[in-house]
Amino acid sequence: MRTFLLLAFVLFCGPAIAQPAHLKLIIFPGGLSWPIFVAQDKGFFAREGLEVKVTETPGSVFQIKGIMAGDFDIAMTPFDNIVAYQEGQGETSFDVPPDLFVFMGGISSTLRLIVQPGIATFADLRDKTLGVDALSTGYTLLMYRLLEQNGLPPGSYKLERLGGTASRVKALTEGRIAATMVSSPQEILPEQNGFRRLGDIQSMLGRYQALSGAARRSWAASHPNQLQSFIRAYVAAGEWLTDDQNRAEAATIYARYIPNTPDALIAKAREAMLSETEGFQPRAKFDPAGAQTALAVRKQYGVPKKDLPDWRTYVDETFYDEALKAK
């Protein structure tokens, strides 16, 4: 786990400098957090009067436990994680009923099933060990669906909990697992080194609401201004990132936060994450159709089995709408 601190100070206004509002954010490491890197480096958080402490999580269980314990205020996490824990289908339980919700989007799809070089077909994965973050959350259920529709029902392969994408990619490249689901752009380096893409969520299952902004409802109700400031900063950073005039500087920022990344890989990461059909969502707008895909998969594979309500049960875009009204 790596933690870094951004000290952001608001501009001089009147006879005194206002104190920044403190915010604790937990994210997954890697290029999927590029807008966060930009918001830090280019001062978008500072302009909103925020002092943001950012923690990179080793996995989804640590992240959700932390936000429920009050160690973190906001999480950038898959929409399905929020559904799982709200429905009692997650990897852990809490002393109080969870009040997690999603307040904005972040990333659509960009999920790949990456396999060892010697794996040519889905049938080759039978009886093999596959790496997952957690057994019942995140992208594991997507992998169940992908494998089953290609002839491999649950039970025809083994699963190993490994935590976030970075840990799983490491296990894959070390030969400890045969396959894993990877969030872009972290599939690029393995593919360059001969690992194969066996499946792609967007082409095989349709749009999928992946990374989303989430918090506890109780925290959001008592900190609406901080939440709206975060949303404005994130959206502004995303707009700056997508502007082609900022391509070179954006690449420099990427390399600063993810050291030793070759320029060619950063260019491929930009291509993957700024695709017209998937990647960073314009203005971080939540995608109901992508959420429906996630809910359909969870309804099929979630344990205990249950009917799930409409996506609106887990989402409140009020803070998002108010934030961008003032932008």
Locate predicted features.
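Short, solvent-exposed loop/beta-turn-alpha elements that line the ligand-binding surface or hinge
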Residues: R47, F94, S203-G206, T277-F286
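Pocket-lining segment of extracytoplasmic ligand-binding domains
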Residues: D80-N81, Q89-G90, A166-P259
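Secondary-structure end/capping motifs
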Residues: A221-K305
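Positively charged n-region of N-terminal signal peptides that target proteins for export
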Residues: M1-F4
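Sec/Tat signal peptide C-region and signal peptidase I cleavage site
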Residues: G14-A18
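Short, glycine-/small- and polar/acidic-enriched structural segments
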Residues: Q19-P153, L159-G163, R168-A171, A178-S184, ...
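Conserved C-terminal helix/tail region of periplasmic/extracytoplasmic solute-binding proteins
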Residues: Q292-K327
